[in-house]
Swiss-Prot record:
Pfam families: DHODB_Fe-S_bind (PF10418), NAD_binding_1 (PF00175). The gene is pyrK. This is Dihydroorotate dehydrogenase B (NAD(+)), electron transfer subunit. PANTHER family: DIHYDROOROTATE DEHYDROGENASE B (NAD(+)), ELECTRON TRANSFER SUBUNIT, DIHYDROOROTATE DEHYDROGENASE B (NAD(+)), ELECTRON TRANSFER SUBUNIT-RELATED. FAD binds at R53, P54, I55, S56, L70, Y71, R72, G77, T78. Pathway: Pyrimidine metabolism; UMP biosynthesis via de novo pathway; orotate from (S)-dihydroorotate (NAD(+) route): step 1/1.
Length: 259
């Protein structure tokens, strides 16, 4: 159930170039039960920036009432968020959206988790949930260069993990699809989050597979009221039917929405 709460900053640190790990504490964590959901963060105390920032939930610890989120500090809002210190309060709205369907993967099956850039973040909680129910996980993490690689070791603790960098400075040179081809990776179910170009490439290959993708869209309200994040349905070529990424998603079955 969505709530609004001022949460305490437990810790914040830069874990890769311009990539920050922020841990917040509050009872709101008890509502975080679906990997792939997100929160809407008020990044500053004053009026500006006006809009909240949507950030994926990376890890949940309900025993400690803590959750972790990862984000890239690149605009005014996220750069402001990166200055928050331990003990300060952050205004959080969430959890929002529909997450990854863990129940679609069965014990003994193999799940392929493919993340690109900051889209790697929500796959960490998902991977933990899948492993807990006896699903074998394989991770492919795609980045531009080695300076922005994060959480490789954490994913490796859960299952086979491959990294691709566009410039070849770490792992396989190229894209996540190059890793799949090079190692001949097979799987029963696919979960993915990342840039549209990556999601389109996966959709072109695996439209007939059981697969789910999480969209990274700019949002205004985060609750489905402003229509800033609509996407059209593939089954309706007229373009009149749509879904809202913030409330109907951000996770959709592959092939459902136009990428």
């Amino acid at each position: 159930m969505m709530q609004k709460q001022n949460m305490i900053v437990v810790n914040q640190k830069e874990i890769a170039k311009n990539i920050y790990e922020l841990v917040l504490q509050g009872t709101l964590v008890q509502q975080m039960n679906e990997p792939g959901q997100f929160v809407h963060i008020k990044v500053a105390e004053g009026i500006a920036p006006l809009l909240r920032r949507p950030i994926s939930i990376c890890n949940v610890d309900q025993e400690k009432n803590e959750f972790t989120m990862l984000y890239r500090a690149e605009g005014q809002g996220t750069k402001t968020l990166a200055t928050r210190k331990q003990g300060e309060m952050v205004d959080v709205l969430g959890p929002l959206g529909h997450g990854f369907p863990v129940e679609e993967a069965e014990a003994g099956q193999t799940a392929l988790l493919v993340g690109g850039g900051i889209g790697v973040s929500p796959l960490y909680e998902l991977s933990q949930r899948l492993v807990a129910k006896g699903v074998r996980v394989i991770h492919i993490l795609g980045f531009q260069t080695k300076d922005v690689v994060f959480y490789e070791e954490k994913f490796a603790e859960l299952g086979d993990t491959y990294v691709a960098t566009v410039d070849g400075t770490h792992g396989t040179k190229g894209f996540v699809t190059d890793v799949i081809d090079h190692y001949g990776i097979d799987f029963d179910i696919l979960y993915s989050c990342g840039p549209l170009a990556m999601l389109r490439a996966l959709e072109g290959r695996y439209k007939e597979k059981k697969a789910y993708i999480s969209l990274e869209e700019r949002m205004g309200c985060g609750i489905g009221a402003c229509f800033a994040c609509v996407c059209h349905l593939q089954e309706d070529p007229s373009g009149h039917s749509y879904k809202k990424v913030c409330s109907d998603g951000p996770v959709f079955p592959i092939g459902e929405v136009v990428l």
